[in-house]
């Protein structure tokens, strides 16, 4: 028996994802046509012996999240439950707080996946590796170049046994080109070190004149409090993958993740990819079109385009490297490149909405997405263009490298701007 836990965070996280996270929780943002964490759930559901999937986070269980859980249970015929933390507890605190729920039924092991990663999720391969050695912690690792490795948790392994000898979260100097993917497989014994951290936090925070539990004791950081502390003690091992992997920290990285997932659909979900048919729009490369979307026959879509529910795409529209969300309208002859068009937004005829791609260096096979700040030296860095919810763009204007917050009605062109 196996279980899976998906760590979805809370509203205080994902600030780099704004304005898109204003409308839906970041884990429910559509990537390649389906909510971000549906890719995780699909991968978990395919593992033989999977009995339950738990989501742990600090979001309020609102209507979108509740509807998603109900739909996921129906589609995958598995219990999918949300466990809400009483406070943000870090990457390990929720696991310890809900340990009884996780261990109910005595699972052999349980997967732990961060919601904000894009991957092909080699969970079956991880399970095979775990069953060969049965150590408490198994981490999925991949490689990054020397410079970008400093932005991740870095792993020094024994190349023969794959034991993690040293772990440093976001080191200041180069440690290793092997990085933590945020995807783990834990045995039930893995919760014992979390208990030790909780008890140590309790002792450190306990005041002599304040009996009772210290409220901060439940905050546990897997990476710093557990992995770094236990590295080199024969408890943590790494399983390396050369498959697709990327973090989804910003809107630009969501667009890149959409491309990766759309390319995987050729093997995993070919039915989700649009095909060129007589009388239909021109399709170039990998494109997802929701069945309820209305797309004019003269529109040209792709590559890497995702069109959501109820979208209207007019005659002569050109769409490339973009996500168009639920209910948006692209009027005749608009051009949308490297952009995300928000829910219910309208782009007027002959308007152009364009961003600058922020993809990894194509000449470096180990390059990863950079999650840089929006600004450098007081100037907005060129990046993809984002239109928030219900933005109205007039006809014949250019919106370039800009972020438009929700419910704005523009009257002219903008370049390199954040429109508040």
Curated annotation (Swiss-Prot):
One cellular-component annotation, GO: extracellular exosome
Keyword Cytoplasm found: yes
Binding residues for GDP-alpha-D-mannose: 85, 247
Tissue expression summary: Expressed in fibroblasts (at protein level).
An individual GO BP term: protein glycosylation
MF (Gene Ontology): enzyme binding; enzyme inhibitor activity; molecular sensor activity; transferase activity
A Pfam match: GMPPB_C
InterPro entries: GMPPB_C (IPR056729), Hexapep_transf_CS (IPR018357), Mannose-1P_guanyltransferase (IPR050486), NTP_transferase_dom (IPR005835), Nucleotide-diphossugar_trans (IPR029044)
PROSITE patterns (alphabetical): HEXAPEP_TRANSFERASES
Effect caused by changing residue 372 to R: Disrupts the interaction with other GMPPA molecules slightly but not with GMPPB
Location in the cell: Cytoplasm
Effect of residue 99 to E: Does not disrupt the interaction with GMPPB or other GMPPA molecules
Function, in words: Regulatory subunit of the GMPPA-GMPPB mannose-1-phosphate guanylyltransferase complex; reduces the catalytic activity of GMPPB when part of the complex. Mediates allosteric feedback inhibition of GMPPB catalytic activity upon binding GDP-alpha-D-mannose. Together with GMPPB regulates GDP-alpha-D-mannose levels.
Disease field: Alacrima, achalasia, and impaired intellectual development syndrome: An autosomal recessive disorder characterized by onset of alacrima, achalasia, and intellectual disability at birth or in early infancy. More variable features include hypotonia, gait abnormalities, anisocoria, and visual or hearing deficits. The disorder shows similarity to the triple A syndrome, but patients with AAMR do not have adrenal insufficiency.
Name of this chain's protein: Mannose-1-phosphate guanylyltransferase regulatory subunit alpha
Organism this protein belongs to: Homo sapiens
């Amino acid at each position: 028996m196996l279980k899976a836990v998906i760590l979805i965070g809370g509203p205080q996280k994902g600030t780099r994802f704004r304005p898109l996270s204003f409308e839906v929780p970041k884990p429910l943002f559509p990537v390649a046509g389906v909510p971000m964490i549906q890719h995780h759930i699909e991968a978990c559901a395919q593992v033989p012996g999977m009995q339950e999937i738990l989501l742990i986070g600090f979001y309020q269980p609102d209507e979108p999240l509740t509807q998603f859980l109900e739909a996921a249970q129906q589609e995958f015929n598995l219990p999918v439950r949300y466990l809400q933390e009483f406070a943000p507890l870090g990457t390990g605190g929720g696991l310890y707080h809900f340990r009884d729920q996780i261990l109910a039924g005595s699972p052999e092991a349980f997967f732990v996946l961060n919601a904000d990663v894009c991957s092909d999720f080699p969970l079956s391969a991880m399970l095979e590796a775990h069953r060969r050695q049965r150590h408490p912690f198994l981490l999925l690792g991949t490689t990054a170049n020397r410079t970008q490795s400093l932005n991740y948790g870095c792993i020094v392994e024994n190349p023969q046994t794959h034991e993690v000898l040293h772990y440093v979260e976001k080191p200041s100097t180069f440690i290793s080109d092997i990085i933590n993917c945020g995807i783990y497989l834990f045995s039930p014994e893995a919760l014992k070190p979390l208990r030790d951290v909780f008890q140590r936090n309790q002792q450190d925070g306990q005041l002599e004149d304040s009996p009772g539990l210290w409220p901060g004791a439940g905050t546990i950081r897997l990476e710093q409090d557990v992995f770094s502390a236990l590295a080199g003690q024969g408890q943590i091992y790494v399983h390396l993958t050369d498959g697709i992997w990327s973090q989804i920290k910003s809107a630009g990285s969501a667009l890149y993740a959409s491309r990766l997932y759309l390319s995987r659909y050729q093997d995993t979900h070919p039915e989700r990819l649009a095909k060129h048919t007589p009388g239909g729009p021109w399709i170039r490369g990998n494109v997802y079109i929701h069945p309820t979307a209305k797309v004019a026959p003269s529109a040209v879509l792709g590559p890497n385009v995702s069109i959501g529910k109820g979208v209207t795409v007019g005659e002569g529209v050109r769409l490339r490297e973009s996500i168009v969300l639920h209910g948006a309208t692209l009027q005749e002859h608009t051009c949308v490149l490297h952009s995300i068009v928000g829910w219910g937004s309208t782009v007027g005829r002959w308007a152009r909405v364009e961003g600058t791609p922020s993809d990894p260096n194509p000449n470096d096979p180990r390059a990863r997405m950079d999650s840089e700040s929006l600004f450098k030296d007081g100037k907005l860095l060129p990046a993809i263009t984002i239109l928030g919810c219900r933005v109205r763009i007039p006809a014949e204007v250019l919106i370039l490298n800009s972020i438009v917050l929700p419910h704005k009605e523009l009257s002219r062109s903008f370049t390199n701007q954040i429109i508040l």
